[in-house]
Curated annotation (Swiss-Prot):
SUPFAM superfamilies: PFL-like glycyl radical enzymes. Transmembrane segments: none annotated. It comes from Streptococcus pneumoniae serotype 4 (strain ATCC BAA-334 / TIGR4). Gene3D superfamilies: 3.20.70.20. This is UPF0210 protein SP_0239.
Length: 445
């Protein structure tokens, strides 16, 4: 690394809010299955606290050594519905509490995997887990939950979609922060390091390290230097910048893997914003020439950004995965918040943007009197985009307050303006239940 690259890296950290957003250890709990739920809970606690005992210390050590902030250390586990199914328990809150206790013991920020995969129907543990979510999130501090309700290969489980509309409402009623830790997916990935949607897939190694990077401020600063130039130049600039960001993620992942004695999994090539000024994906899009995010051209700008981040990142590391793209959470991005407040960004435009970005309707506050069926219909729309386009989409909706209010979450979760929701009913649509079949182009064999 020459002196110019060293000074560039220092500037990225000190002036442009570059950080490693997360080191996430994925842990399989399949060997913790037990017909007695309390014994299963104890096995889960013991395995997590043993395997991840040094995760936080190693993360802090690497951050100090390289001078690069590592914002979060997290754990993801096997979907708990698979573990709970071996028991005769009627709810899995005790397993959520075991996860929470383990997370607090090892000092991680979040633990993900209170999850179920129901894209084609319910198995024994799935419905029990889903109905346990409101209490599990209300009675724990660090547990995150996700449910996969659709996939390109399976279609969309509309019965589960309806159930999740109800569960989101119940979760919001039981706790202030619970819904911020609950994601509904289509095409969920098994190696996602980001919360709240991380879980450890059954096809993964027993224990693995995945890394998520963050650098929208770095990309914006690079684009400031090419103002007025063609999109060819913009694309090349984003690609080269993404390469630098991802290269550091690769280094951190390899170091963590070696020191913890576990396999290195992937680097997630996502641009993840924070509420801090200078760390916004929205401002990157505006730097391309948009007066404000939400105006015409926003989706095209996001498409360019997303694609070039992937192209630059793929070259920088040997294994990429996770969600890999630009995150557009409203509450976690000061530019997105401003666009909602000035009226240029609405739910319909956000939905269009999710056909491009790496997640979906993320950290969006809606009025608390929004019917469960309307929330379910939002989930169905997002799932349809993901299923048809063969990409991951998700919904993390916050039903709180009334239109125009500001909902304060604090920390990385930021502040969300409560957005207007279409008032026309979707009740008859959602009440049908059943399965929307897989699209014709999913049949590849």
């Amino acid at each position: 690394m020459d002196i110019r690259q060293v000074t560039e890296t220092i500037a990225m950290i000190e002036e442009q809010n570059f950080d490693i957003r997360t080191i996430t250890m994925g842990i399989s709990l399949l060997d913790c299955i037990d017909p007695d739920i309390n014994r299963a809970a104890e096995k889960i606690y013991q395995k997590i606290t043993t395997k991840a005992a040094n995760l936080v210390a190693v993360g802090d050590e690497i951050a100090a050594e390289l001078g690069i902030p590592i914002v979060n250390k997290r754990v993801s586990v096997t979907p708990i519905s698979l573990i709970g199914a071996a028991t005769d328990a009627t709810d899995y809150v005790v397993l959520a509490k075991a996860l929470d206790k383990a997370a607090k013991e090892i000092g991680v920020d979040f633990i993900g995997g209170f999850s179920a995969l129901v894209q084609k129907g319910y198995q024994k543990g799935d419905e029990i887990l889903i109905n346990s979510i409101p209490r599990a999130l209300a009675e724990t501090d660090k547990v995150c939950s996700s449910v996969n309700i659709g996939s390109t290969k399976s279609g969309i489980n509309m019965t589960a979609v309806a159930d999740m509309g109800r569960i989101i409402k119940e979760t919001a009623n039981l706790s202030d922060m619970g819904v911020a830790k609950l994601v509904v997916f289509a095409n969920a990935v098994e190696d996602n390091p980001f919360m709240a949607g991380a879980f450890h897939g059954v096809g993964e190694a027993d224990v693995i390290i995945n890394v998520g990077v963050s650098g929208p401020g770095v990309v914006k600063r690079a684009l400031e230097k090419v103002r007025g130039q063609s999109f060819d130049v913009v694309a090349e600039t984003v690609k080269k910048t993404a390469f630098k960001i991802t290269r550091i993620g690769q280094l951190v992942g390899q170091m963590a893997s070696e020191r913890l004695g576990v396999e290195f999994g992937i680097v997630d090539l996502s641009l993840a914003p924070t509420p801090a000024v200078g760390d916004s994906v929205a401002r990157v899009l505006e730097e391309m020439g948009l007066e404000t995010v939400g105006t015409h051209g926003t989706t095209a700008a996001l498409a360019l950004l997303n694609d070039q981040v992937k192209k630059g990142g793929v070259m920088a590391c040997n294994q990429v995965g996770g969600l890999s793209g630009a995150f557009i959470p409203v509450s976690e991005d000061e530019g997105m918040i401003a666009a909602v407040q000035n009226g240029s960004l609405n739910l319909e435009k956000l939905e269009a943007m999710t056909a491009i970005c790496s997640v979906g309707l993320d950290m969006i506050a809606i009025p608390e009197d929004t019917p469960a069926e309307t929330i379910a219909a939002m989930i169905a729309d997002e799932a349809a985009i993901g299923v048809i386009n063969m990409k991951t989409t998700a919904v993390r909706i916050i039903p709180k307050g009334k239109e125009g209010d500001m909902i304060e979450f604090g920390g990385l979760l930021g502040t969300a303006p409560v957005m207007k929701v279409n008032g026309a009913s979707s009740v008859d649509f959602i009440s049908r239940g059943g399965q929307i079949p897989a699209p014709i182009h999913s049949f590849k064999n």
